[in-house]
A protein has these predicted regions:
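Active-site and adjacent substrate-binding regions of carbohydrate-active enzymes
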Residues: 1-532, 537-558
């Protein structure tokens, strides 16, 4: 396969975001400072040194805005404030200052496809009549059939069930329906409405003016809807369970790109231009590349890589397809293994089927080999951090945390659980609070006598930051060494990428300055012979230049 390197000046660009390693913080589960069992901003500030020592370039903070918390904070009632459970605006300002002092950039989650149903704009729409200016800011429609008892169309929700809910008029009679592609408490806004555009423009400027370095645009591919809201033609069920959901008239619609261009102009107007990352779940890398054209977003989440599983042909196909699609638009790739929406990859890699469905719809209920998953996760870390472009680390990934799959049902909070009729447990298992220190829960996440909002497994005493920091063979030590080498050796930050000839189930490539990565996904050991001198391995068992199965190594060519 050909070398992947552009001739449009990309190699000379030094924008920090092109090769950044960004650490996702889910604030409820990061660190609790005030003994209420829920993580907060002061907790994040108290643990920033861990992230600096880890060697990340930026943090991305999941929603911390005022919210009824019907979807973990992704139902936002006030975009320009902080939910009291996390702190206040002054805490956020201090966090920005602390992070910047450590050389860490800050990105915030930005949810613009929908608001909370408690947002003042939606509350005003509820009290306004049909056809009013207030209702035009969302999608209110009359129903179909006798008495309007059927939804306006057949669209289905990402969390299961139909994407429409019906209002009750003040006199008790049935009213109009409103659209929500996610939970009923998350009504979709109408991006053709000027009031909506101006409101979100103000939100963008509010956070940029406070010193935020960038925004991660949640559910960007959902923001456009085809005119007339035509039927999608799907069978009943969950949006993400459908094989052709990406072709829906409410997903990846072309005119949503004008919204992204609007924000890019705002961000580019600052002395140090701001950065946008988009979450776009679309059909293939070619469609994905449209979101990172020069006048749109800077980078985008790579779900194809996340879903590739532990398959050499599939991983190779995704890497090649991603680099081919992004090169013409001059955008860097990003690589991600886990997030707050996915079953943790260590657990996925310990299963017979190692891929994942998006949005946490993982109901496989099969036994997991965590030893195998850990071995593969270590190799996947070296693979991911060796690829050209940027990378994401989801909190706890650097500790080798598995999915918590035995949370008591009465504690599950993800709306997927209820909306799916208790068929899909949702995403709570990847959101369990982090273990920092100690021999028993809450492992330093909170005070010893506090019960976290989700319980931690008792055996996580082996996976605390303190325990792993002193163990040279731990997952944390591996991540720290890999990130240190990634910063130290400039070749990892260059766009050069050349495939090396290896057996089908062995992935090998060369980056700049003769840096090489070899990953053995086969059932047999692989001899890497004279490919180079070992810099770092996912396993210490690299005798006689032999790479065991499910292991990876970084090499320096002679």
């Amino acid at each position: 396969m050909p070398e992947r390197s552009t001739d449009d000046g990309y190699a000379e660009r030094t924008d920090w975001w092109r090769t950044a390693v960004i650490y996702e913080i889910y604030p409820r589960s990061f660190a609790d400072s005030n003994r209420d069992g829920v993580g907060d901003i002061a907790g994040i500030r108290s643990r920033l040194t861990h992230l600096a020592e880890l060697g990340v370039d930026a943090i991305w903070i999941a929603p911390w805005y005022p919210s009824p918390m019907k979807d973990g904070g992704y139902d936002i009632a006030d975009y320009c404030n902080i939910d009291p459970v996390f702190g206040q605006l002054s805490d956020a300002d201090e966090l920005f200052d602390d992070a910047h002092a450590l050389g860490i950039k800050v990105l915030l989650d930005f949810v613009a496809n929908h608001t909370s149903d408690q947002h003042p704009m939606f509350q005003a729409a509820l009290t306004a009549p049909a056809g009013s200016a207030e209702r035009d800011r969302y999608f209110f429609r009359d129903g179909k059939g006798p008495g309007g008892d059927e939804p306006p169309n057949d669209w289905i929700s990402a969390f299961g069930g139909r994407a429409w809910s019906r209002l009750t008029n003040p006199d008790g009679s049935p009213g109009q329906w409103y659209l929500h592609l996610f939970a009923p408490e998350q009504p979709d806004v109408n991006w053709d409405n000027a009031d909506v555009q101006e409101m979100f423009d103000g939100v963008v400027r509010f956070w940029f003016d406070r010193g935020v370095d960038g925004l991660r645009v949640d559910a960007a591919s959902a923001m456009g809807k085809k005119a007339g809201l035509p039927d999608a033609g799907h069978e009943p069920g969950a949006l993400f369970a459908s094989s052709d959901w990406v072709d829906n008239p409410h997903w990846d619609v072309d005119h949503l790109h004008q919204i992204l261009r609007r924000w890019r102009k705002i961000g580019d107007g600052y002395p140090e231009p701001k950065v946008f990352v988009t979450e776009a779940v679309v059909n293939g890398p070619e469609r994905l590349s449209r979101y990172v054209r020069p006048d749109e977003m800077h980078t985008t989440f790579n779900f194809d890589y996340l879903k590739a599983g532990w398959s050499a042909p599939r991983i190779r196909q995704v890497i090649e397809g991603t680099l081919q699609a992004l090169a013409p638009v001059g955008a860097p790739a990003t690589w991600v293994l886990s997030s707050h929406d996915e079953t943790r990859h260590l657990t996925r890699f310990g299963r017979p089927s190692t891929g994942t469905a998006v949005m946490g719809f993982d109901s496989s209920n099969v036994a997991t080999d965590l030893e195998l998953g850990t071995k593969r996760a270590r190799a996947a870390a070296l693979l991911t951090l060796a690829l050209p472009g940027g990378a994401y680390i989801y909190q706890g990934e650097e500790l080798g945390l598995p999915e918590v799959e035995d949370l008591p049902e009465h504690l599950l909070q993800d709306p997927t659980w209820e909306r799916s009729g208790h068929q899909a447990r949702g995403r709570d298992g990847c959101r369990v609070p982090l273990p920092w220190s100690g021999a028993a829960p809450p492992f330093g996440f909170s005070a010893d006598d506090v019960h976290p909002w989700l319980p931690q497994p008792a055996d996580w005493h082996r996976l605390t930051v303190v325990a792993e920091r002193s163990d040279p063979d731990s997952m944390l030590s591996l991540y720290r060494r890999a990130l240190s080498l990634r910063r130290e050796l400039a070749g990892w930050r260059r766009p050069t990428f050349v495939w090396l000839h290896t057996p089908p189930d062995v992935i090998a490539f060369e980056r700049g300055d003769g840096l090489r990565c070899v990953v053995n996904l086969s059932d047999e050991a692989f001899s890497f012979g004279d490919l180079g001198t070992v810099l770092l391995g996912s396993s210490n068992a690299l005798e006689e230049k032999v790479l065991p199965t499910d292991c990876a190594v970084w090499l320096q060519a002679r």
